[in-house]
A protein has these predicted regions:
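Short amphipathic C-terminal alpha-helix that caps PH/PH-like domains
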Residues: 2, 256, 365-373
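Small/polar-residue-rich segments within soluble enzyme cores
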Residues: 1-35, 236, 350, 367
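Beta-lactam-recognizing serine transpeptidase/beta-lactamase-like catalytic domain environment
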Residues: 18-25, 67-116, 121-354, 358, ...
Length: 384
């Protein structure tokens, strides 16, 4: 990423020698040039906390400054010690690395189904489309029937007639099925892009991907298959063909926290608060932001994120997700959040592959990271 700045330039000597290879004289020489120092945005305290919380599980943690987009932590597990490559690596070490679950893969930059964390995007599309207001209510039920197929509520039963705030707090699938069918996949894809899905830079890091929210036209082009109403239903709750990277998840929730600005993630401190990384307006209205925030706060105050409301840290806001994985594997666990609520400073995203429920595996990791940040912040001024 920064080799050009760090490595400098080799020096050289041009020497005349005789037939025996003995030096006769120096014809010319070029002095070496030292490399430049590079300061990263990473907070070593938060980075360690994220890695320790992940505890070598397959997954990722990303923490951003909600105002500037500076990457404060980016952990991917399982990890490895890169210092072993400063010398000749032994065969045993290489075999041990190969036995692990692909430690060379930066999972912070890989696409995953975002599950219910994506309901932030669907809420935005619903209200900003004009087809719903922030005060709209819909009836929920144990399931809805679409194209002869039943799409179920995650809790088994409905939640009655509710609005967006409670739909986020309860994570009602049948509420968001209806929103998705009303606004359509194109609107969802449009607002997902504005919030950072598929439009967030990987900061020059190799081996990553970008998220995507396929539309009917793209599905036809990529797979040669028509779009079904069931595809829209799945998209609305972050399943099906939707893919989002943990970095993009953090960008989305940062935009909710900072007033609707899509931050530009970056790793070099020299890029902070420069035109290159200036946050971009998403066009979200204040009422939309307030509605989503109230739902995310409710998740922490009494919903699936209530482990974060134990009094050990200031009040935060967030959303859990539990993503289905093909092949009968255990679900992926997700969490996105920001804090503190009264003065948002950091946003984070957590995924644990095959971790089960978001509240079970991802929320405890988020709690440890938030706690590390807030404990440090009590003895240090807030982020700029």
């Amino acid at each position: 990423l920064a080799n050009r700045q760090l490595e400098g330039t080799w020096g050289s000597h041009l020497i005349e020698v005789d037939a025996a290879g003995q030096q006769l004289r120096i014809i010319g020489q070029k002095a070496p040039v030292s490399g430049s120092s590079v300061k990263l945005t990473l907070d070593i305290h938060l980075q360690k906390a994220a890695e320790q919380a992940l505890a070598q599980r397959r997954g990722a943690v990303v923490v951003l400054n909600v105002k500037t987009g500076a990457v404060l932590a980016m952990a991917s597990g399982p990890s490895f010690d890169p210092n072993i490559f400063t010398r000749r690596i032994t065969q045993a070490e290489w075999k041990r690395l190969q036995r692990q679950d692909n430690p060379f893969l930066n999972r912070a930059l890989q696409g995953y189904p975002p599950a219910s964390t994506f309901k932030i995007v669907t809420t935005t599309a619903g209200i900003e489309s004009g087809k719903f207001s922030a005060d709209s209510v819909l009836g929920t039920a144990a399931y809805i029937s679409v194209g002869g197929h039943l799409f179920h509520e995650h809790g088994g039963g409905g939640y009655g007639t509710i609005g967006f705030r409670d739909a986020i707090a309860y994570s009602s699938n049948t509420f968001f099925y209806q929103v998705g069918l009303t606004v359509g996949p194109e609107n969802i894809a449009k607002w997902g892009g504005r919030l950072g899905i598929g439009t967030t830079s990987n900061m020059g890091l190799e081996g990553g991907s970008r998220g995507s929210i396929p539309t009917p036209a793209e599905k036809e082009r990529l797979f040669g298959e028509p779009w079904y109403a069931g595809d829209t239903v799945s998209t609305a709750i972050g399943q099906g063909l939707v893919q989002v990277t943990p970095l993009e998840m953090a960008v989305i929730v940062a935009a909710i926290a900072n007033g609707g600005q899509r931050v530009q993630p970056h790793l070099f401190a020299s890029e902070t608060n420069t035109p290159k990384t200036r946050p971009q307006p998403t066009g979200m209205h204040q009422r939309t932001l307030e509605t989503i925030r109230s739902g995310l706060i409710a998740v922490v105050q009494g919903g699936t994120g209530r482990q974060l409301n134990d009094g050990s840290i200031p009040l935060t806001a967030g959303k859990t997700g539990t993503a289905e994985v093909p092949g009968g594997q255990r679900n992926n666990a997700l969490y996105v959040g920001y804090g503190p609520v009264n003065n948002p400073q950091i946003a984070l995203a957590v995924i644990v592959e095959n971790g089960g429920y978001g509240a079970e595996a991802a929320v405890p990791i988020a709690h440890q990271v938030f706690k590390a940040y807030f404990n440090k912040a009590t003895s240090k001024s807030p982020l700029p």
